[in-house]
Amino acid sequence: MPYHSKSIKPLTSIVSYPERGDGGDNRYRGNCSPKLIEDLIGFFKPKEICDYMCGSGTTKAAADKAGIRSRLYDLHSGFDIMNCDIPERPEFVFCHPPYWDIIQYSDVMYKASDVMQKYGYDPKRLDLSRIESWDDFVKAMNYAMMKQFSALENGGRMAVLMGDIKKKGRLYSMLAEIVKPGTLENIIIKAQHNCFSDRTQYSGKFIPILHEYVMIVRKDSPVLIPILKTQSSTVDIRDMPGATWRDVVAAVLEQCKEPVALSFLYEQIEPHKKAQANKWWKEKIRQTLQINPMHFTHDRRGFWSLNRNAA
């Protein structure tokens, strides 16, 4: 009897697999537990599963156990997701992209020279895990995401396993920045086990990452596809609709190392939307300074500073 027709424990929004299970090569860094893919197959019951970044073949092992067909591809075996056409119209795609450059694959997990000899291209030039900048990685990841989603048959699904990266005090979130085409059906949190961070004591305010995400998107229309994507921008607080007068005045003063004249505050705020939206903006600045003694200090006549000791 095929695995996916058995009675299994339903998927929930949090999954955990302390024991990895059998399938794929556990020496292949970043390899996920086949139990996750087995549970996805058991829950959604596809007749076939495709994986275009298959790594060591964990998806095939899960599909074989479930008794369904699998089609697997990877850069190390002649398939470049950025330039090759997807040959199928998949019903279900499992995608486990690299987590930026945390683990590099070409010429680390496999020999680039072997790929060059067999397929005629240098995988290091095409490897998403060798992209230097985060922004360029996101662009490549999102192109690959849209390419796979576009190939889905109507009603098909993609399950994307991804994680977050921390570098130099900043979080780089794949979940936040990956493009989300179609219907966003589920986000599953997957606990990580046997991580390097489990054995490491961190100083400062570093919070170790002990989870990944599984994002499931569904194609509900063959032609018109809704897309949810992140747009990064920089906004001046003096132009932000939600900023109060106290916020704006404090922001200007926070840049100053010594008390400044009231005229300086006028100059800094006048060109911006906060002032342009209020006919009595000068009066509002003076009122804001006077009614917030906890935050602003009147140092001498006409000069103000930010009280940096305020709670």
Predicted regions: what is each one?
Residues 1-292, 298-311:
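Class I S-adenosyl-L-methionine-dependent methyltransferase catalytic core
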